Swiss-Prot record:
Annotated family: Belongs to the class-V pyridoxal-phosphate-dependent aminotransferase family. PhnW subfamily.
Cofactor (UniProt): pyridoxal 5'-phosphate
Protein name per Swiss-Prot or TrEMBL: 2-aminoethylphosphonate--pyruvate transaminase
Keyword Nucleotidyltransferase included in the entry's annotation: no
GO biological process: organic phosphonate catabolic process
Main function: Involved in phosphonate degradation.
Modification N6-(pyridoxal phosphate)lysine occurs at: K193
Native source organism of the sequence: Burkholderia mallei (strain ATCC 23344)
Catalysed reaction equations from the record: (2-aminoethyl)phosphonate + pyruvate = phosphonoacetaldehyde + L-alanine
Key words of the record: Aminotransferase, Pyridoxal phosphate, Pyruvate, Transferase
GO MF annotation terms: 2-aminoethylphosphonate-pyruvate transaminase activity
Length: 369
């Protein structure tokens, strides 16, 4: 008999619905008018979810979310700019690495891996250094599941007259974001996260005026957001071969997103998943790494068992054999592992995951207390 698909307790790729997977069974011509209409409808809905209005445009891009992050930074940030990067995890550090490779001056503002970025500290940093032109913020630092206070930081940037670029890779669709009201200049996310599509397409939702001012700025051909946008405006087509099946799956996923009730309903389901998971894991003896006030309902980091019998590869394999896929830890300060709460999942799947983890502890002889 064929193996049953495992349930992915990861922050993307994630478990998708049958309707989303079925959408990939059709082939599309990349220059066909029907596919162009598909692209246009997806982009319009993404701007709507972000609360962007007419002042913002969506630029899709082939590749993972990091491709879109690098494309956005490389296109929107001038080479003589100076960027403040609040850093409390691996994905914040990745932004700094991209800026370094692009040759763009930047300043990292460090926070602990369990500490949300402080709007007050960001305000003070901007006040100290008038050369800072941009802030590049990770909304939800997936390495721990840490939520940074986007609205407060956006208010600081707006008051200080600094541009704000937001990596919303793991928050877009699950948490409320209002681009126009917040004054955010660009938001970046991807198809295979909280929208519950499949991986393969990133996108940036950008203030139209900022994008139109960025012509010729990108050092890359493939990652030039302005050129991608301008070409789509002229032709309705992608510059290079588009991920046709990924886009079709995202269209189906967006239809389900709206049918569910949009961001409020999606966020509420993830919150129920998270609460079910944390309660069940605590009953087994596990503790979350983050304080509940900083915890996002997308992915939870748990301290690893202290028992010497614990080793993540064997633990992972035992849980995988029961039909669930965990995520390794990504912290520098503690031995941890992560469990995602997103995807086409509900509380029943979270209870099943807890049971599988409990079974793994028993089969491997790992004591929790």
């Amino acid at each position: 008999m064929p193996e049953r698909d495992p349930i992915l307790l990861t922050p993307g790729p994630l478990t998708t619905s049958r309707m989303t997977r079925d959408a990939m069974l059709r082939d599309w011509g990349s220059w066909d008018a029907a596919f162009n209409r598909l692209t246009k409808s997806v982009c319009a809905d993404l701007v709507r979810i972000a609360g962007g209005g007419d002042a913002y445009v969506c630029v899709p891009l082939q590749g993972s979310g990091t491709f879109a992050v690098e494309a956005t930074l490389g296109t929107l940030v001038p080479r003589d700019a100076r960027v403040l990067v609040p850093n409390n995890g691996a994905y914040c550090a990745r932004i700094a690495a991209i800026l370094r490779r692009l040759g763009i001056a930047h300043v990292e503002l460090p926070f602990a891996e369990d500490e949300p970025a402080s709007a007050h500290a960001i305000d003070a940093a901007l006040a100290r250094d008038a050369r800072l032109t941009h802030v590049a913020l990770v909304h939800l630092e997936t390495s721990a599941g840490l939520l940074n206070p986007l609205d407060d930081i956006a208010a600081v940037c707006r008051a200080r007259g600094r541009a704000l670029i937001v990596d919303a890779m793991s928050s877009f669709g699950a948490l409320p974001i209002a681009l126009a009201a917040s004054g955010i200049d660009a938001l970046i996310s991807a198809s295979g996260k909280c929208l519950e599509g499949v991986p393969g397409m990133g996108f940036a939702i950008v203030r139209r005026s900022a994008l139109e001012a960025a012509e010729g700025r990108s050092p890359s051909v493939a990652l030039d957001l302005h050129d991608q946008y301008a070409y789509m405006q002229r032709t309705s087509q992608w510059r290079f071969t588009p991920p046709t099946h990924v886009l079709a799956a995202l269209r189906a996923a967006l239809d389900q997103f709206f049918d569910e009730g949009g961001q409020p309903a999606r966020g509420a389901r993830y919150a129920r998943n998270c609460a079910t998971l944390v309660d069940g894991m605590r009953a087994l003896g596990f503790e979350p790494f983050l304080d509940a006030r900083a915890q996002a309902s997308v992915i939870v980091t748990f301290y690893a068992p202290a028992d010497p019998a614990y080793a993540f590869p064997a633990f992972y394999a035992a849980v995988r054999d029961a039909g669930y896929v965990l995520y390794p830890g990504k912290l520098t300060t503690a031995d941890t592992f992560r469990v995602g709460c997103i995807g086409a999942l509900g509380a029943d799947e979270m209870r099943g995951a807890v049971a599988a983890i409990g079974g793994a502890l028993e089969s491997l002889g790992i004591a929790m207390r």
